[in-house]
């Protein structure tokens, strides 16, 4: 009976200790303020938020799932009066660069917009193919989108307009006239990522202090000399070795029985927010209980969530094909 009362009290205490953090995360995600206002309240800019979020391992795991799911979908190229040879060449070129396009799409989802630069190379028959796509996620802050849909590179030499027809790929996520840079998921993910990275630095001092066991010795000491002599042998025993004691003496170990439930609950709160934002649902492997039915539901919701990313990827793929056709019709082998 005492065990049941103790267990219930402990569970309530853990929930109480983490309720303030849970409420703060809930308030952050339910707030309808825009990206710029939220970043201002957090005290970081777009690039800082994006870099912090992308470097998190839980975010990286979710992005890997999304990246694999996007590449797993079938694709087909169609065009009126398009010959089989040109269609095969366009498809092989697109297929080779689909992973890079998917990376830029994920950057657009996290950072509000994604930018990639096409690097062209001529082939022996005169066809201008795209050799490489340079993802500009590491310097996204230097590329400024404007309300008219144009993109400007702001470097040390001033501003320079970017050719978004054939040279640059520019994909924005939910861009509006008042927010041409798009809605970035990294702004809302910054708080749970910071909790995962920095919150447990604070908790580590308690782990260091209370996770180690304590040895307690009870002896029959007739004088301080007897006590000091035993303590000297006891310290040597702790460092390694053996210890002999009298029949009336006793040595026991006290160890903290806490299993880290409070810390695990905080981590689960952060992971759930990250997964729900990116995947649309918390993974069943991170839930306390999971069933076959819930796993099937998770797969269905995951497929629906992938549709939003595929819409961005289809825009990127269409831009890729259009750029190839325009460049070759103007300077290379006409298609």
Whereabouts are the PLM-identified features?
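Structured, contiguous alpha/beta core segments that scaffold functional sites
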Residues: 2-44, 77-237, 242-245
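Detector for Asparagine
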Residues: 31, 72, 135, 163, ...
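Short linear motifs in intrinsically disordered/low-complexity regions
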Residues: 32, 46, 52, 57, ...
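A eukaryotic "domain-start" boundary segment
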Residues: 39-77, 83
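Intrinsic-disorder/low-complexity, polar/charged segments
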Residues: 51-59, 184, 222-223, 306
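Surface-exposed loop-to-helix/strand elements on domain peripheries
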Residues: 81, 219-220, 243-315, 319-335
């Amino acid at each position: 009976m005492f065990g049941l009362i103790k267990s219930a009290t402990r569970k309530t205490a853990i929930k109480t200790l983490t309720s303030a953090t849970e409420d703060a995360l809930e308030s952050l995600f339910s707030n309808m303020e825009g990206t710029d206002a939220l970043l201002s309240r957090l005290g970081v800019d777009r690039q800082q938020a994006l870099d912090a979020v992308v470097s998190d391992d839980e975010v990286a795991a979710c992005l890997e799932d999304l990246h694999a799911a996007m590449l797993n979908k079938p694709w087909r190229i169609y065009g009126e009066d398009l010959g089989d040879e040109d269609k095969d060449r366009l498809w092989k070129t697109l297929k080779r660069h689909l992973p890079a396009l998917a990376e830029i799409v994920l950057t657009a989802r996290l950072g509000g917009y994604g930018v990639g630069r096409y690097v062209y190379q001529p082939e022996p028959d005169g066809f201008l193919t795209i050799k490489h796509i340079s993802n500009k996620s590491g310097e996204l802050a230097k590329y400024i989108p404007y309300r008219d849909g144009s993109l400007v590179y702001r470097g040390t030499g001033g501003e320079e307009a970017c050719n978004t027809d054939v040279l640059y790929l520019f994909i924005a996520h939910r861009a509006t006239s008042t927010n041409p840079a798009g809605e970035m998921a990294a702004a809302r993910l910054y708080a749970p990522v910071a909790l995962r990275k920095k919150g447990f630095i604070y908790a580590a001092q308690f782990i260091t202090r209370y996770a180690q066991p304590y040895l307690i010795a009870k002896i029959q000491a007739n004088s301080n000399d007897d006590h000091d002599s035993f303590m000297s042998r006891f310290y040597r025993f702790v460092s390694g070795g053996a210890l002999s004691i009298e029949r009336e003496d006793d040595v026991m170990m006290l160890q903290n029985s806490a299993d880290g439930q409070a810390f695990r609950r905080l981590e689960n709160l952060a992971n759930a927010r990250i997964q729900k934002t990116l995947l649309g649902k918390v993974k069943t492997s991170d839930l306390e209980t999971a069933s076959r039915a819930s796993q099937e539901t998770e797969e269905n919701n995951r497929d629906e969530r992938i549709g939003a990313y595929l819409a961005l990827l289809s825009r990127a793929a269409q831009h890729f094909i259009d750029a190839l056709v325009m460049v070759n019709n103007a300077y290379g082998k006409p298609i």
